[in-house]
C-alpha cells in the first residue's frame, strides 16, 4: 500500500492558514473512500470500479497528490512508466514511432523511458535488466539484429510484460509490425513497371530482420516478373542505416555496371545514394530511378522528391503501446495478438522510366 507521497504543498481556504503536505488519507477523505481503495486505484486500477476510480483520480487532481514511485516499487507494485527500446533513437522512423508511443502512454496517465540499444544485443540485455529493476509496467522492444532469439525464460521469470515493435516473435507474444516483404515488392514492381530490368537493392544493419525481409521482397518481385534474380538484381549490404552507408553503397555500385533502378532499405540510405550518384555526375531520375523506404517527413522535400514505401509508423507505435498497456493490466481476457500492418508506395519525382 502506498502510504507516502512526494511532498506537495496545498493551500487551505484562506491566507495566513497553515500549508500542509497532501497525504493519501487526504485523497481518501476527498473521494469518500478508504485509503486502501486509493492505493488500489494508483497501483492496480483494474481492480477498482470505474466510478470509484474516477472519483479517486478527480480527488488526486484537485489536491495535487503525487504518488511516491519509490514507495510503490518497494511494495512490489509496477510503476506508471513503460520502457521503449529501439535500435537507433535518432532514426526518423523510430522518432515518429516513439512520439506515437508517448501519446498513447500519456492518454493512459503513463510516461515513457526511451532507450537506445545501438543494435547491440549486450546493451539491449543491460537495458532490459535495468527496466525490470525499475519495475516498469512493461517494455516495447525492437530487438537488435544479432539478438533475434530473446531469453524468454528470463523475461517470463520476471513477469515483465513485453510487446515487440516492428518485429514478429512468436504466437506467445504480442507484436505490431509492418509487412516488409510486401513493401519491397511494391517498390521493385514499380521499378520493373517503369522498364528497369537491372535493379539494385541496398540494405543496412547486416542481419537486421527488416532489411532481410525487404531483400526477400525484392527477389520475389524480380522472380515474379520472369527475370533471374542472380542477374537482374544486385544486392549491396552496408553495416549501418544512415546517409554515409548509402554514400558508400553508391560508390560500390559505380565500380561496376550501374543498375538503372535502385531500391534502398530506408530513406536515409537513399539520400546517401543520391549524394554519391550526384558527385559522380549521375542524375536522378534522368539516369537512375531511386526508391526509398519509410517515407519519412522530409522525403517529399528532398532535392528530388523521393518515391518511397510509406510505413504506418504512427499507427505502429500507438497500437503497440495500447497492446502493452492492455497486456500489463492483468486482464484475464487479454489475448496475445500479432498485428501486421500494410505499407503503401508513394510515387514522386525520383523514379522515372528507363531509357
Protein language model regions, located:
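Alpha-helical recognition/docking segments in bacterial nutrient-uptake
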Residues: 1-19, 77-189, 193
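N-terminal helix-turn-helix DNA-binding module of bacterial transcription factors
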Residues: 1-79, 354-355
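Short beta-strand segments enriched in small/hydrophobic residues
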Residues: 30, 35-39, 74-90, 190, ...
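Short acidic/polar active-site loop segments enriched in Thr and Asp
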Residues: 34, 137, 196-198, 259-260
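Hinge/beta->alpha junction and helix N-cap segments in small-molecule ligand-binding domains
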Residues: 69, 87-96, 114-123, 145, ...
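Short acidic capping loops at alpha-helix termini that bridge into adjacent secondary structure
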Residues: 197-199, 229-233, 283-289
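Flexible loop/turn connectors
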Residues: 251, 255-355
Amino acid at each position: 500500500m502506498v502510504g507516502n507521497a512526494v511532498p506537495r504543498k496545498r493551500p487551505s481556504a484562506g491566507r495566513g492558514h497553515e500549508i500542509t503536505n497532501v497525504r493519501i488519507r487526504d485523497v481518501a477523505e476527498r473521494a469518500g473512500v478508504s485509503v486502501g481503495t486509493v492505493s488500489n486505484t494508483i497501483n492496480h486500477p483494474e481492480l477498482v470500479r470505474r466510478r470509484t476510480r474516477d472519483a479517486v483520480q478527480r480527488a488526486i487532481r484537485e489536491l495535487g497528490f503525487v504518488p511516491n514511485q519509490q514507495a510503490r516499487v518497494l511494495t512490489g507494485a509496477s510503476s506508471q512508466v513503460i520502457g521503449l527500446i529501439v535500435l537507433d533513437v535518432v532514426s526518423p522512423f523510430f522518432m515518429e514511432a516513439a512520439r506515437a508511443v508517448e501519446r498513447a502512454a500519456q492518454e493512459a496517465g503513463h510516461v515513457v523511458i526511451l532507450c537506445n540499444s545501438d543494435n547491440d544485443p549486450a546493451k539491449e540485455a543491460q537495458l532490459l535488466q535495468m527496466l525490470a529493476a525499475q519495475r516498469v509496467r512493461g517494455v516495447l522492444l525492437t530487438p537488435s539484429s544479432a539478438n533475434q532469439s530473446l531469453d524468454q525464460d528470463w523475461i517470463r521469470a520476471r513477469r515483465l510484460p513485453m510487446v515487440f515493435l516492428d518485429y514478429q516473435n512468436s504466437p506467445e507474444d504480442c507484436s505490431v509490425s509492418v509487412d516488409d516483404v510486401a513493401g519491397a515488392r511494391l517498390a521493385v514492381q514499380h521499378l520493373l513497371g517503369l522498364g528497369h530490368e537491372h535493379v539494385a537493392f541496398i540494405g543496412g544493419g547486416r542481419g537486421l530482420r527488416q532489411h532481410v525481409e525487404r531483400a526477400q521482397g525484392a527477389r520475389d518481385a524480380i522472380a515474379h516478373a520472369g527475370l533471374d534474380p542472380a542477374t537482374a538484381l544486385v544486392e549491396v549490404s552496408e553495416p549501418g542505416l544512415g546517409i554515409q552507408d548509402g554514400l558508400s553503397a553508391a560508390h560500390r555500385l559505380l565500380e561496376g555496371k550501374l543498375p538503372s533502378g535502385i531500391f534502398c532499405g530506408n530513406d536515409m540510405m537513399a539520400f546517401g545514394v543520391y549524394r554519391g550518384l550526384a558527385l559522380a555526375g549521375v542524375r536522378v531520375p534522368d539516369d537512375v530511378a531511386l526508391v526509398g523506404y519509410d517515407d519519412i517527413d522530409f522525403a517529399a522535400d528532398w532535392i528530388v522528391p523521393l518515391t518511397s514505401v510509406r510505413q504506418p509508423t504512427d499507427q505502429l507505435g500507438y497500437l503497440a503501446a495500447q497492446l502493452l498497456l492492455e497486456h500489463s493490466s492483468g486482464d484475464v481476457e487479454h489475448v496475445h495478438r500479432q498485428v501486421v500492418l500494410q505499407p503503401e508506395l508513394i510515387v514522386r519525382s525520383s523514379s522515372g522510366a528507363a531509357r
